[in-house]
From Swiss-Prot:
Protein source organism: Bordetella avium (strain 197N)
Note accompanying the cofactor annotation: Binds 1 zinc ion per subunit.
Keyword Hydrolase: yes
Protein name in UniProt: Adenine deaminase
Binding site for Zn(2+): 14, 16, 194, 275
Record SUPFAM superfamilies: Metallo-dependent hydrolases (SSF51556)
InterPro entries (alphabetical): A_deaminase_dom, ADE, Ado/ade_deaminase, Metal_Hydrolase
One GO BP: adenine catabolic process
């Protein structure tokens, strides 16, 4: 089934570019930029990829991002991800990037954006992969910081298809960012938001009602709220689910417990994504294969999941 899944056209709608930083590239960029790493070698870094929760992962994720310094670094990161898309039958991707992760350590916004944009343009031309970039705000930082990031981004308004909300979920409900999302919406930028991963179903309601999002990133805890499930079935708001991520971060103890196929059969608009593939052990194809192995996903279910992803893109 792997060859069939590889050939199946699909979109990826929940991928953090910084989370596609493979250990080999991380070490190469550290050497290029003279960055001293806390790990002696690639094997030691891989051994550090053990997390009990989202915050433990994020601590490592932000540490790894420190090697990204130049436009070429961001190009190389994005291009490596796009090559993986081409290998796995991903024909359209809408990646997130976290400018605050970089600007807060002195990397200019334009440096980050230029490298990513150049790679996405080359991906369209050379690999035939369509794409749209999502500007994500870090929810563990104050809304004022997100507003400053939006100010910095607006001169490049045409570079983005949407704004998003990510980072530590617990204790940082979507309502804290209502003003900055309203401002982005006034500028013509639609919204997506991470909700219902570690946070409760109430966070999904807030993202829908107060941030007016077009998609929910993760959303697996919607299953705990029958009224929310009925609403999501009725509205067909897409949920960008990331199975390997959910298991690695202990949202589910084992892939056999994951609810994504139950959600699909209930009529929810779910699709499969990799989230932070370098850190969670797989890209989109590996996520599909995990569902096949542990949940017995059928070809018909895989076809529906892929069709959902393509129907849920924000850019044509």
């Amino acid at each position: 089934m792997q060859d069939w899944l590889t050939a199946l056209p699909k979109a990826e709608l929940h991928i953090h570019l910084e989370g596609a930083l493979e250990p080999e590239l991380l070490f190469a960029l550290a050497q290029r930029n003279g960055v001293t790493l806390p790990w002696p070698d690639i094997d030691a870094l891989r051994q550090a990829y053990q997390y009990q929760n989202l915050q433990e992962f994020l601590d490592l994720y932000y540490q790894g991002a420190h090697v990204l310094r130049t436009e070429q670094d961001f190009y190389d990161l994005t291009w490596a991800y796009l090559r993986k898309c081409a290998e796995q039958g991903v024909t359209h991707t809408e990646p997130f990037f976290d400018p605050q992760t970089h600007t807060d350590r002195g990397v200019p916004f334009q440096v980050v954006l230029s490298g990513i944009q150049a790679a996405l343009a080359d991906g369209r031309r050379d690999l035939g992969i369509q794409s749209g970039l999502i500007l994500s705000f870090l929810r563990h930082l104050p809304e004022e910081a997100a507003m400053r990031t939006l100010d910095e981004a607006l001169p490049y308004r045409d570079a983005f298809i949407a704004v998003g909300l990510d980072s530590s979920e617990a204790g940082f409900p979507p309502r804290l960012f209502e003003r900055v999302f309203a401002r982005a919406r006034a500028e013509g930028l639609p919204a997506v938001a991470h909700a219902g991963e570690e946070g409760p179903p109430e966070y999904i309601w807030e993202a829908l009602e107060r941030l007016q999002v077009k998609r929910i990133d993760h959303g697996v805890r919607a299953w705990e709220d029958p009224r929310l499930i009925a609403h999501l079935v009725d509205t067909q708001i897409p949920l960008t689910v990331c199975p390997l991520s959910n298991v690695r971060l202990q949202v589910f103890e084992h892939m056999g417990q994951h609810n994504v196929l139950e959600m699909l059969e209930r009529g929810l608009n779910v699709c499969i994504n990799s989230d932070d593939p370098a850190y969670f052990g797989g890209y989109v194809l590996e996520n599909f294969m995990a569902l096949r192995e542990h949940l017995g996903m059928s070809q018909e279910q895989a076809r529906r999941l892929a069709a959902n992803s393509l129907a849920s893109v924000l850019t044509a």
